[in-house]
Swiss-Prot record:
Record localization: Cell membrane
Keywords: Cell membrane, Membrane, Transmembrane, Transmembrane helix
Family: Belongs to the UPF0324 family.
GO cellular component terms attached to this protein's record: plasma membrane
Protein name: UPF0324 membrane protein Cj0999c
Annotated transmembrane regions: 12-34, 44-63, 83-100, 105-127, 134-153, 163-185, 197-219, 234-256, 269-288, 303-325, 338-360
Signal peptide segment: none
PANTHER family hit by this protein: INNER MEMBRANE PROTEIN YEIH-RELATED, UPF0324 INNER MEMBRANE PROTEIN YEIH
Topology of the protein relative to the lipid bilayer: Multi-pass membrane protein
Any Pfam family the entry gives: Cons_hypoth698
């Protein structure tokens, strides 16, 4: 048993080695750029953003020699991606989720539901996009950015290029909003918002967890944002992240059911996102580890830190691989419509999120 497992592992490494090595070079450079303080202070870009940018710039070269690297790049975009999503559970504990309460859960669920439904309608009816692309952009805008896009793409087994387009939009609009929110709040452009309300608004409407953390940090410098308000923002965002699990199950089920009824496919086309359950299990494990000081002589804080580092590494690998697979001809042909949909959803998040936050003001805290 051990021998066969080892042989299988060696076979995987051999078949994917060139592509993994090539992707690893991009990952190392991306993580280096994100660690340089002057670059970090200027751009506020995470390693994930640098990875996809570098990947995009190198994509013409990759397509020229893809027969050498395709297997490893595909492995990074699929297998390492799922592992990264599972390990994302090391960023969340059940205690943090419960601290938000039922009303925080309700706010997050409303945002996800309406943004996704609007994405599906506007994307297919107005921008004439296919259903899968509309769903991917909607998931990225509604839940947790690139991680949600990639998780849904993996569940639906859709064309990777659709995921690449969707990831591009959520990365760009997430960064724009990350800078926009603190500036607008410092200029008092959000009437009736105190710091806690702004924290809820950030957590309920920003695309990525990194966007929420970045916006809250900038708000500290620009508007004297207190730590309590920053915590509210992150916790509300984490509630949206945890809702990724039921979201994947529900959407995958209905999408497969619709495909079956319209095209006569068998039930085998239904893909159960087991990694979503593993993600939930990792949250439970992280909660347990956080409650202990050490296990078998090893500090639990070190285990959690390792889990977070491996999560980041896997996601950065996946982002680099996705960037490499961008076909500029296809991108120029359909990218503008995808960005149009993401822009509309951005407006929905800003204005809809503003009024929703006001509606919940006084109940959430």
């Amino acid at each position: 048993m051990k021998t066969s497992f080892l042989a299988h592992s060696v076979a995987i490494v051999r078949s994917n080695f060139k592509g993994l090595l090539f992707t690893a070079c991009i990952v190392i450079f991306a993580m280096y750029l994100s660690s340089v303080q002057s670059i970090k202070d200027t751009t506020h870009l995470a390693a994930t953003a640098f990875a996809i940018i570098i990947g995009v710039l190198l994509s013409p070269w990759f397509f020229k020699y893809q027969h050498h690297f395709q297997a490893g790049v595909h492995f990074s975009a699929k297998k390492l991606l799922r592992l990264g999503i599972v390990l994302y559970g090391f960023n969340i504990t059940l205690t943090e989720l419960l601290s938000v309460g039922l009303k925080g859960f309700l706010l997050s669920a409303i945002v996800i539901f309406f943004v996704f439904i609007i994405a599906l309608f506007v994307g297919t009816k107005i921008f004439k996009l296919d259903k899968e692309t509309s769903m991917l952009v909607g998931a990225g805008s509604a839940i947790c950015g690139a991680a949600a896009v990639l998780a849904l793409e993996s569940s639906l087994k859709s064309d990777p290029f659709k995921g690449i387009l969707a990831v591009g939009t959520v990365v760009i609009f997430g960064l724009v909003f990350m800078f926009l929110y603190p500036i607008a709040f410092s200029l008092n452009l959000f009437p009736f918002f105190d710091q806690n309300a702004m924290g809820v608004f950030m957590g309920a409407t920003l695309h990525e967890v990194a966007n929420v953390a970045g916006a809250a940090e900038m708000a500290k410098d620009m508007a004297g944002f207190e730590q309590g308000a920053s915590n509210v923002a992150v916790i509300i965002k984490m509630m949206r992240v945890i809702l990724l699990v039921p979201f994947l199950l529900i959407v995958t089920y209905f999408f497969a059911k619709n495909q079956h009824s319209s095209s006569g496919k068998t039930a085998k086309s239904i893909t159960i996102p087991y990694f979503a359950f593993a993600f939930l299990g990792m949250i439970v494990l992280n909660t347990y580890l956080a409650s202990k000081e050490s296990i078998l002589g090893i500090a639990t804080s070190d285990i959690i830190s390792l889990g977070k580092t491996l999560c980041t590494l896997c996601i950065v690998f996946a982002m680099a691989a996705l960037g490499l697979q961008i076909d500029f001809k296809k991108f120029l042909k359909s990218g503008s419509r995808v960005f149009g949909l993401a822009f509309v959803l951005g407006l929905v998040l800003i204005f809809g999120g503003y009024f929703l936050t006001l509606a919940f003001k006084g109940i959430l805290w």
